[in-house]
């Protein structure tokens, strides 16, 4: 669910199958701001007229903008505060257009309690359920009880 525990979870409070999500509607301003931060002004992202002429049929979000919401889930919800992002693999499977509502979800699929390492399935979907980013992350849950 969308349970946010800002103080974070200790490894002993977590279990395989636990998951959390974050949703946001992607605005043109989000894409322009992200382009400004990272310096990627590819016209498919920032020029709506040009983007209409591409295979995407319109302006799309940067893949890394879409994927960055995985970090929101991990840092704000599960495991939350004191989480250390160790590793992430990503597969970009479909575009995100201006106005799409994305939902990033992370689910614990394995735990190394001794080393406080979580293996998490990470997925981002849009409003119709289409998977736009698929991946897996390794996170260290360093919060102490």
Features from the language model and the residues they span:
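Short, small-residue-biased leader/transition segments that mark boundaries at the very start
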Residues: 1-4
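Short amphipathic
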Residues: 13-28
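Acidic-glycine-rich active-site phosphate/pyrophosphate-binding loop
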Residues: 36-48, 133
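Hydrophobic beta-strand-centered segment that forms part of the acyl-chain substrate-binding groove
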Residues: 53-61, 67-105
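Conserved positions in beta-strands of structured domains
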Residues: 93, 107-109, 125, 138-140
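Short, conserved beta-turn/loop elements at beta-strand boundaries and strand-helix junctions
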Residues: 111-115
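Surface-exposed, gly/pro-biased binding rims or lids
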Residues: 130-145
